[in-house]
């Protein structure tokens, strides 16, 4: 039996993702929004982490992703980068470009993408939209930033689409999604998210592209899958999209744990002796002296804030 420790797993790059597609190895991707979650998913063995603008709904409590700002994406991306470094450092980090950060002009898009890399620690950025963003993608890629595309249901266009509904169900719309996929590959995207499209369409798109496809609500035929971490953990029992499988009931576990804590505090059972500090050399001040000292304090001295 060898005494040598196992070799560290290689960092997942855009080239490794392409190799995984070519070899048939599925890509496992999840979202993360802070350092703690990033460390946990890294240790669990994910191939890629997405700092999604879904944080607007999953973390900030908004009803859509639209209010999320570029500054917030930079902030959360930097946290996730630090968390991944505390894990095994293997996962590929992609950060969403927020609504309004790339739609107005290619110049603004390049500047926003560079911020996400330089300040947020991202290795790549993801943006939503089809062939109409081809020039924006080309400009970002020429600036040295890899781009992951995103077509199908694009949450930043929720009002245009009339809600969060499956896309590409009729022949004409399916053909448009296929045309968009080819255009994004030609523009330089290294991977493509397919969201909420029929499984049959996702299979065709995946077979016709050289770049990896990563599905969410797009069936089993994509080269990889991505889920919102909060959804797969079951953090919100009231919100479970049809395409989500809950791999845990963490929300219920959190409620049980906090409920137990509240109960023990109310019952004066916590903290007990095992969770308290002791010292035999502490010099106690008599109550009388403490009261006299308090009377001598200036009337506006109310103590240090907590």
UniProtKB/Swiss-Prot annotation:
Q: Matching InterPro entries, A to Z?
A: Pantoate_hydroxy_MeTrfase (IPR003700), Pyrv/PenolPyrv_kinase-like_dom (IPR015813), Pyrv_kinase-like_dom_sf (IPR040442)
Per the record's keyword annotation, is Cytoplasm included, yes or no?
Answer: yes
Per the record, the GO terms for biological process are: pantothenate biosynthetic process
Which GO molecular function annotations are given, in alphabetical order? Answer: 3-methyl-2-oxobutanoate hydroxymethyltransferase activity; magnesium ion binding
CDD domains named in the record: KPHMT-like
Tell me which residues bind 3-methyl-2-oxobutanoate.
Answer: 53-54, 96, 126
Where does the record place a coiled coil?
A: none
Question: Which reactions fall under this protein's catalytic activity?
Answer: 3-methyl-2-oxobutanoate + (6R)-5,10-methylene-5,6,7,8-tetrahydrofolate + H2O = 2-dehydropantoate + (6S)-5,6,7,8-tetrahydrofolate
Q: Does the keyword Magnesium apply?
A: yes
Q: Which Pfam family, just one, is annotated for this protein?
A: Pantoate_transf
User: Which parts of the sequence bind Mg(2+)?
Assistant: 53, 96, 128
Q: Quaternary arrangement and interactors, per the entry?
A: Homodecamer; pentamer of dimers.
Family affiliation: Belongs to the PanB family.
Q: What is this protein called?
A: 3-methyl-2-oxobutanoate hydroxymethyltransferase
Organism of this sequence: Anaeromyxobacter dehalogenans (strain 2CP-1 / ATCC BAA-258)
**Gene behind this chain?**
panB
């Amino acid at each position: 039996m060898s005494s040598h420790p196992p070799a560290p797993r290689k960092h997942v790059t855009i080239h490794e993702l392409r190799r995984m597609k070519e070899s048939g190895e599925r890509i496992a991707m999840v979202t993360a929004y802070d350092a703690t979650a990033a460390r946990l998913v890294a240790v669990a063995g994910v191939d890629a982490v997405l700092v999604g603008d879904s944080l607007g709904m999953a973390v900030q409590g908004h009803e859509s992703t639209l209010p999320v700002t570029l500054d917030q994406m930079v902030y959360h991306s930097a946290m996730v980068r630090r968390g991944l470094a505390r894990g095994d450092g293997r996962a590929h980090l992609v950060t969403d470009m927020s609504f309004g950060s790339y739609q107005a002009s290619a110049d603004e898009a390049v500047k926003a993408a560079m911020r996400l890399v330089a300040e947020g620690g991202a290795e790549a950025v993801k943006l939503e939209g089809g062939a109409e963003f081809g020039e924006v993608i080309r400009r970002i890629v020429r600036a040295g930033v890899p781009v992951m595309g995103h077509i199908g249901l694009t949450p930043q266009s929720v009002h245009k689409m009339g809600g969060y509904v499956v896309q590409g169900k009729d022949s004409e719309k399916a053909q448009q999604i296929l045309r968009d996929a080819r255009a994004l590959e030609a523009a330089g995207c290294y991977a493509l998210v397919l969201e909420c499209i029929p499984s049959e369409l996702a299979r065709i798109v995946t077979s016709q592209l050289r770049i990896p496809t990563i599905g969410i609500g797009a069936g089993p035929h994509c080269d990889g899958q991505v889920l919102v971490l909060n959804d797969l953990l079951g953090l919100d029992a009231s919100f479970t999209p049809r395409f989500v499988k809950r791999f845990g009931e963490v929300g219920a576990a959190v409620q049980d744990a906090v409920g137990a804590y509240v109960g023990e505090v109310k019952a004066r059972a916590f903290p007990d002796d095992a969770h308290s500090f002791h010292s035999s050399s502490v010099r106690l001040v008599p109550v009388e002296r403490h009261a006299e000292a308090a009377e001598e304090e200036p009337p506006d001295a109310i103590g240090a804030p907590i």
